[in-house]
Amino acid sequence: MKCGKPVDYRYGEHTADVLIQAYGCTLEEAFKNAAIALAELTYHTEKVEPRYAKEITIDYNDLEGLLFRWIDELLFLFDTEKFAISREIVLNLGKNDVYYIKAVLYGEPYDIEKHGFTGLIVKAMTFHMMEIRQIDDYWMLQYVVDV
């Protein structure tokens, strides 16, 4: 989908932390790109085959909390199961009483020989400098992770 977004995501300088800005023509696309940006800090997602599916359902009463839980869940999957996500993510974001994400992540077990190591291990998600906003015809999600 075409829109005026500058890029899918980019990184900013931050001491002992990494600032990530993820973009999307839709809020769903921005959340997908936020996941890919997180993974790319550790390994090359384009080398991950979508061999296995992991279903994730999360909710929160605001978008900032939803973003925090989304990234935190991805960190948990990598830390506990060494599940490397591919760029294939099916994501449905909506709102009933609360905001929710129902997603299917495709990937496979992390293999340093196959997926590489890009130099960083993400330790935790933070609320520091978090921002979610619509800019003209695209969305920007900004968040900071501890490395």
Swiss-Prot record:
InterPro entries: Archease (IPR002804), Archease_arc (IPR022952), Archease_dom (IPR023572), Archease_dom_sf (IPR036820). Gene3D superfamilies: Archease domain. Ca(2+) binds at D17, D146, V147. The keyword Signal does not apply. One of its GO terms (molecular function) is calcium ion binding. It comes from the Archaea. GO terms for biological process: tRNA splicing, via endonucleolytic cleavage and ligation. HAMAP family: Archease_arch. This is Protein archease.
